[in-house]
Amino acid sequence: MIKLILTDLDGTFLDSKGSFDKEFYQQVKGSMDDQAIYFAPCTGKQCERVEELFGPELSKDLWILGDSATRIKHNNEYVYESLLPNDLGIKLINKLEEIANDYTIIACTPTAAMIKETTSEEDKQMVRGSYREVQLVEELNKITEDFVKITVYDRKKRCFEYVKELMEFKEQAYIVASEAAWIDISNAGVHKGTTVKELQKLLGVTKEETMAFGDGLNDIELLNAATYSFAMENAFEETKAAANFITRSNDEQGVLQKNKKITKKKKKN
């Protein structure tokens, strides 16, 4: 019996325009609620940005694994987080600034996602697509808080190459190029898979009672935490290989279509 359904957002739950059919979602979510199935977005987006995307009503009772699954938020309360120590975060920022000076570094703290004042307007808009709380700072290496995560956005799509230059930190932090334009860095041993396990403990749900959807390379650990693991038709081949099943693409509402079928089957049973 499925008790928990998790989904990545970009490229998975959201379509190519970054949106979803709210009416269809309400129908499917109603069926999930009737059957006491928990629903949890698991995403690189800031938790507050997820709440903004779903809106006040639709975000009620969501279990949000946000900020690259370094935090779990439920009904306005953080119930779990694992932070990257400030001193290590500053070393990583300094290294990233050495590697290149023409990409955007997003240094996320519990307060806000921080970017440099010199960030282009185009990249500022891109950042605001994933983060509601954003602050502009003169220098990222002057931040004094611990970090939720550090992210690189590279419009030139060189992240698969640049991530290799961070391997000196691989024992100290979890580092992944989720796709050619993105690198995500979080506390050591903290990724979507480990945070899903924290949520499963909180809810008393097993891997065998869990369903998950993903498309990116950073979703592989998420899929490994669920017996019913689905890669999207538009997923990376490595992600498809890690999944037990393949479903329709994000532009075909694959997540909602599959959830509709699953909840219908449960009603019949």
What does each model-identified segment do?
Residues M1-L4, D21-K22, D184-N269:
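Mg2+-dependent phosphoryl-transfer enzymes with acidic/Ser/Thr/Gly-rich catalytic loops
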Residues M1-T7, Q26, G30:
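Non-catalytic pre-domain segments flanking phosphatase-related domains
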Residues K3-G18:
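Asp-based phosphoryl-transfer active-site loop
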Residues L9, K45, G214-G216:
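Active-site metal-binding loops of divalent metal-dependent hydrolases
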Residues F20-E121:
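Active-site phosphate-binding/coordination module
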Residues Q35-A40, K60-L62, V148-K149, E208-T210, ...:
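Short active-site oxyanion
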Residues L58-K60, S68, F169-E171, A225-A226, ...:
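Short, structured coil segments at secondary-structure junctions
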Residues N101-F213, L217-E221, N234:
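Conserved acidic, metal-coordinating active-site core of Asp-based
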